[in-house]
């Protein structure tokens, strides 16, 4: 059943209808294309700026702020932002908002409690990022942190019964190889490093952060698929748990020091920039990625690695040697290959197979030729990245 005015209609429309039908898709396509490029720019800047800003804030001379307080402040701001967005969705009606939150958070308390697990892991992950970036160069961290793609893929296979293509498995192996080369370069020296840096602790923090990121992302995806709550509601619930759990972690790790020196000890404009980036960055990506496909996300990650490396050379005197360039290149290539939709991945695989020699493919008699992958609905099923799922849930 085709809708009226659908592009696939076989009826011959009148001249006016043809003109309208020809103009609207073109205008929509141009607007969508612009939004895709804006999405790419935003993703690149957000991916790179968070890492660089944390590194910059943690290496500034003077009093060093407490990382646990920054994590708590980011959760508070994120929760308040989601609350304002829900308030706007209720058209500024406080009564409707209160009734909605009472029903969604308190009455349906089972769904709320389910979010305690990913919230705990996300809070731990945010604290681990500070540990890792304080002990590793920003470019090294950015490359190594791409292991989260590997952990997310593995948890998706285990928890969601997803299947990966051969090209995706090969790209994961390529990713691991590239990260190993970068870490070998880091362990081998590569110039003097500050005395307060511990690359071993930084690597352990990155690996733990990648494991927690992969598990929490897939777990959160599973929750979103099994519930009807909006993305902003779920992020508000995450923010509530994140604030509470962050305060517990603050008290346990740095409670005495914070009580003595104050919650905002060591805060500078650079630190506030980190807090705002952490608070709004994830929400911004969740919205922006609606207009970006997985290829653009792969490009964004790859470009952010390049941007982080260039900025690290400029800001922190980072030295790029051939070993780092090789490892980073492998990671960038792996990210791009993994981000390809299944149809494109199969097309690349078939193209490489035909290029390796004469391909003798005999179609069984009586069977129709295989369908074109580019028109197959399965092309829309891409790799299990959480932001893509968020947009899918939003539109459902």
From Swiss-Prot:
Effect on the protein of changing residue 297 to A: Does not rescue defective Gb3Cer expression in SLC35A2-deficient cells suggesting loss of UDP-galactose transport
Disulfide pattern: none
Keywords: Antiport, Congenital disorder of glycosylation, Disease variant, Endoplasmic reticulum, Epilepsy, Golgi apparatus, Membrane, Sugar transport, Transmembrane, Transmembrane helix, Transport
Span(s) of short sequence motif ER retention motif: 392-396
Outcome of substituting residue 258 to M: Found in a patient with Rett syndrome-like phenotype; uncertain significance; able to rescue defective Gb3Cer expression in SLC35A2-deficient cells
UniProt cross-references to Pfam families, sorted A to Z: Nuc_sug_transp
Domain of life of the source: Eukaryota
Effect of residue 188 to S: In CDG2M; uncertain significance
Associated pathology: Congenital disorder of glycosylation 2M: An X-linked dominant, severe neurologic disorder characterized by developmental delay, hypotonia, ocular anomalies, and brain malformations. Othere more variable clinical features included seizures, hypsarrhythmia, poor feeding, microcephaly, recurrent infections, dysmorphic features, shortened limbs, and coagulation defects. Congenital disorders of glycosylation are caused by a defect in glycoprotein biosynthesis and characterized by under-glycosylated serum glycoproteins and a wide variety of clinical features.
Record text on subunit structure and interactions: Interacts with SLC35A3; the interaction is reduced in the presence of SLC35A4. Found in a complex with SLC35A3 and SLC35A4.
PANTHER family given in the database record: NUCLEOTIDE-SUGAR TRANSMEMBRANE TRANSPORTER
Designated name of the protein: UDP-galactose translocator
Gene: SLC35A2
